[in-house]
């Protein structure tokens, strides 16, 4: 069972941040912090980043 690395949280201004659960810091994609998102964007991005992270870990353990 793989533990998801990324999750999302609602900020005080109503926007959403995708963050790394191990560091608590906002995720970066191509150097851009993933904050100020709407809920749908954040939810889709969490799914994508977790999928890519799981694939990366599977490849390194082969």
Residue locations for each model-derived region?
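Short N-terminal "domain-start" leader segments
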Residues: 1-20, 25
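Generic ordered-secondary-structure signal
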Residues: 16-17, 21, 28-35, 62
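A short, charged, amphipathic alpha-helix used as a generic interaction element across diverse proteins
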Residues: 30-60
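Non-catalytic signal-transmission and effector/linker regions of two-component phosphorelay proteins
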Residues: 7, 61-62
């Amino acid at each position: 069972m793989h533990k998801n690395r990324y999750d999302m949280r609602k900020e005080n201004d109503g926007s959403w941040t995708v963050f790394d659960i191990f560091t608590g810091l906002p995720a970066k994609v191509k150097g851009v912090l993933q904050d100020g998102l709407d809920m749908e964007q954040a939810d889709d991005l969490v799914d994508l980043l977790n999928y890519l992270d799981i694939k990366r870990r599977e490849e390194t353990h082969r």
